[in-house]
Amino acid sequence: KANGRKTFRQIDSVSRILELGRDTYREGKLSRESIKMICEELEGLKHKMEEYKITEYRAYATSAVREADNMDLVLDVIEHTTGIRVQVLSNSEQRYISFKGLVAKYSDFHQVVSKNTAFVDVGAGSVQISLFDKNNLVVTENIPICAVRVRDYLALIGHKSGRLDEIMADYVDNDIVSFRNIYLKDKEIKNIIAVGEVVSSLKKIVPELSIKDVITRAQFDAMYKRVISMPAQELAEKYGIPYERATLMLPNITIYQSFLNNCKAEEMYVPDVDFCECIVANYMDEGSRVVFNHNFEEDILATANNIAKRYRCNRNHVEQTAYFALKIFDVVRKPFGLDKMQRLQLQIAALLHECGNFINLHDGARNSYYIVANTEILGLSHKERMEVANVVKYNPLYLPSKDKISAELDGCDYIVIAKLAAILRIANILDKSHMQKIEDISVTLKDGKLIILAKTYEDISLEAGLFEARADFFEQIYGIRPVLRVKRSV
């Protein structure tokens, strides 16, 4: 419930754990029995919503449904059986919502991330690691360590070996070490913020330590020894933990231990934040119902900038291209129905449009497409990221008609791609020399023309000569003709 002070309070809470991941990660799809249980539980929640006269809701599915081969069938059955429409979150959307919830609830967040900090989000299907430095998001990477698969592997070999902790560490360490070698190198991580489904349960198993929000390395080691020495059933009964979560405690704590060992952090922050609270925080933020002391868009752009840095993009060129692109966008935004997210997509596309040159210069645009399409950008859905990838691809390349590439678009909006690519082509050509000859531009829409007034004291014959060809495509998409005019600065 939201109140007038732009905060919210919980008025009721109901929950039920259904272990759907077991089906997906073992069999590749959700079983008929699991689908039936989902529908039964959602019917109960539907009655609860009717009790409170709820008219607006959010129903999300994550990796257990997202990675199931029968995902579309599952969603269709749920909607027709319960009337509830479920939205499947991409991994980046899911982790971004978790991040928002952490910022909303954890009052010490900004103080902690002022130093080199790793945000480690362990889910049932994978692990998301995000690195912060001086309050800025430096990099985020999804590592395919599946806690459910790790648990099943433990069950398979556990009775055959007395070296369970060593085997477990070997199983997990490979991916964590690869992450360290690529992203950490000599960087020293001061803090770890641990979130995930079992973090609050982990704190319960060492009640004598009275752990609240911070775990020292010595406390963590004591916690690890207790988890590895007790079977899941005993952990569940002794500490009042749901059995399904108890079975995931050893895989989770092994993952955290591996990261602690590889980054040498001495403290781990464990705020009590569950995903439902994160969903509420995201809902409040989307509707501007609450004001966060954090700029999430800057985190998304920081991720894009670090991808550009990784692939040795010409920083001066891509930043000027982005600046010019946004100036054009802001003029055509309202009359042509563009929105805030598309502005962000355009900015990211401008920052990353040359990243493919790192692979080779012969086919840079297609290389850039593959890099963007396969790189995690926290805060963008799969569809939004693929639209950015296509904008980058069709910045220099011919854009075929929709019917010729509809299969390749994978649900992306063709019109959005065309509109953003048209802007990027103009912005990019204004710095064709990569020498920033144009100091600034002013953009106006007048008499069916987009007037771009370039301020420069340099010879921009190259840019002006190539401008007309790019203007043809822009006019084809928007129905207005870009015109380049030059204002000589002294």
Can you describe what each PLM-predicted range is?
Residues 432-438, 476-480:
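Short secondary-structure junctions
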Residues 1-9:
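N-terminal basic/disordered segments at the start of proteins
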